[in-house]
């Protein structure tokens, strides 16, 4: 029966003709042969079959070079015609047409269109059902090529292929007698799971079916009738299938057993075929470090150690290796080396694994590698402590294999290495598809916490990094480790080993600290041993991830010193990627928990030290200059003794980075500088950018050291910002911003820098004059590069206020004019940066009393508050908050001219804009309410009396009340309560008599008693204690409501479900006690019955907390509460004095009860302090 009868007729389509002279030779051959094929009609004669057979052979043997000019639709049309010509009862022809489908689709990288795919799928599925079993292998290969990246277009056939009794389910089953057919069926399933971005994915039920099928295959032992290479290919296909399901986060592993089962097989096959290891894994890994997780055949500790701790043990064995054997090992390395970044899935249906790989090592950047003197090759042919590959120790005699057997062994090792690589890449996809907190439950299964000495749990990712003979597998393992470490700061922060551990059990914190130590040890061992540049780059990136997240302030000293000393030589490595990643690592060291005393000492190491202790055996080092000698330096202990504090020894790292940025490159290390432009005299751009980044991090973390180079760094910045490359310009601007920020920090009131250690103002003025006379203004006006403009704006906002006032007048005017002009920019990045910069300038003492500048800035900010970009509005709201802070500062100066001259109309506009902004997103809202509070505080009686202001004041206060009560972010509600306190400070507002008074107080009392966040409660209690007069609290009922709410809040000051809030309990009680005493100080005779009633019910509780308040002193709160016990005691005395002055009606007991309560508190204070001398003021009691 002809194939055409299986699926009905489908036109093969017209083949496109291309101009003859434009068609390459391969395209010509294809068109000639396809024209002959299209001319044929279905015919069962033997001559017709012979002709078709010959045509198929010719099409298969045709040389299809890249860019052969063959159109995908022509290939699809030809395959449809071929299938129409071959009836399903002709097994040999069906086999041949299947080979043709597989060959053409793979060779020409064609994905079949949906219409022809339908026909070809129906044909191949029918062929499997009807043809002899010996054809199934070729038909399945054709099916795999057809469904490749076409899973979403195969919906019609999914039930037939993947249903309970589906074709692929049966052929991939363990019961399938032919191992090759089983492997090919799994290959088809893996290709079905592969999807193209933007297209629909495989439906969830079928995803689960495939996942379970792949998992079953991986959990099943190798059957006796399957050879090792077929088994490796089967494993690869199953692993690639799972990877395709996980990629892009499409399939979620939500069940613990499901994830644990997958991790168990991944761990098993990460080590597949690694010599000397025979891993027996449980079916499921559970997220607890139990000893049964990882059993393996015991190995003598000496053997396990030999390739890591004791490299000398292998010397004899290395000398026995024959040159011929080494070449085979080298060939195997070339075959399995390459970049992990090359997506391993995309070739699933494009490589016939039977035919071996045809990768060209040179095209992958693998260096040709020499042999060492003894004739032994290392991982890449370079002698190292790990150079004797473990598989060479499998046999007791090197001559046990014939050449043919040796070739087979080499091929076997190559396939096993690929299984390990695919397992690692699949693990990478798994990591990306699960939450980090879930992943860290399995930390101990993959990360070592003790040196590897053959114990059951000692195999880990570091085993592969140190012992795998394939550089690509080592790179894969490192990339997985990097993914695990990335974002692990919170998890690792629990680590601690600063004190000696002498407990009966090992705390979790000590176990994590041990893991961190072991990771350092193993990665530094790997660094010494590695000679492949690509893998070396991965090791250094991995170290950078580890250094960024490890809590060195909680770990014993010397870990960073070892990393520091060992990485220095690699800064002069001949491969630019290694050099760049080495600088990245140094940047990570100077940014982690900065400033660290250990790093401070490392930065102060003398520049004259040599390389004697710093891995002088490391290859590819060029002769270093005086600052490039990468000193190992003395130990940390020696340094602390020999380097006096304040040593003027230059910082070698700053010198190095400056030289990389500004000095011409050396020829000796430019061999593989792919990043440098042709003819460039400088280091490659990535190297210079990384050096600028390190300088920026040094300025951020170790400014006291960096400031010694202030003017020199200024010249570096000017040079960078004057270059043509916008990236170099931008990084120069970032460095300028960081230096400016460092100078500002030195002059802040809370700075730890002594006045004589600060950079003098005249020097800062010189520095900024150099900047403003250099290329900075040009960068600010470079509208072609808005990112650079925004960076330059940020830099300009980091001028020290004291220096700005001393700049030449024309430079001051330049800064202000440029910023006000850029606020009109159409680019949102520039506009956001400008809005923020104006918010900084408006706080400068020399500008804040300039009414014209403040008004111009206000108008610019109000315009930005209406921008479509949230980021622009957020920055504008922050600046509006700063501007209103300036209004308050000016209000408190003796000179009233600013208030008088500031436009009332502009105040109205600011109030309206702030009200609108308070309805915006939280990022805008938090500063909008801050601004509202300041503006209402600033309003003068002359404003409030005007009818135009009455309505806007009411609206503003309603906006604040609604924000206090809303379920917004903590910062928003905190700022709203703070703003309400500012409103209460304005004596001109009718607080106490206005209708909004009760609403405002009710909002604050609601928050103080019930808000989940204690910082917001503290701020609302502070606001309630702001009014200075009794009448501002309104009626007796209003006063009683506030008093009762504060007592209730005190009672509930420990009621929280959030453990993090407990640290604010003491501050909350302090603020509530202060508010209660403040209310007592203002109470009138009519308020006393309510106070007495509350004290009768809760007097003991209130008394105990007020006693704590008096005795405790400062609680670290930020609300302005009196901080010394003497001051607090005085508050209670004043309240008692006030009570005594109240004229109560005859027979009134309330005043006496309240006075008794206060006297009792003071008496207890006197008694408790008697042994140490009475507190001031109690001696007359």
Swiss-Prot record:
**Cysteine pairings via disulfide bonds:** none
Q: Could you tell me where the Basic residues compositional bias lies?
A: 313-325
Q: Which residue intervals correspond to the HEAT repeats? A: 159-198, 452-490, 514-552, 558-595
Which of the residues bear the PTM Phosphothreonine?
Answer: 618
Instruction: Quote the biased-composition stretches of kind Polar residues, using this chain's numbering.
Output: 300-312, 637-646
InterPro entries attached to this UniProt entry: ARM-like (IPR011989), ARM-type_fold (IPR016024), DUF4042 (IPR025283), HEAT6 (IPR052107)
Q: At what positions is Phosphoserine found?
A: 336-337, 399, 402, 643
Q: Which keywords has UniProt assigned to this entry?
A: Phosphoprotein, Repeat
Region Disordered: which residues?
Answer: 294-347, 371-407, 613-648
Q: Mark out the compositionally biased spans (Low complexity).
A: 383-399
Q: Kindly name one Pfam family recorded for this protein.
A: DUF4042
User: Which PANTHER family does the entry link to?
Assistant: HEAT REPEAT-CONTAINING PROTEIN 6, MALARIA ANTIGEN-RELATED
Recorded protein name is HEAT repeat-containing protein 6
Q: Source species, please?
A: Pongo abelii
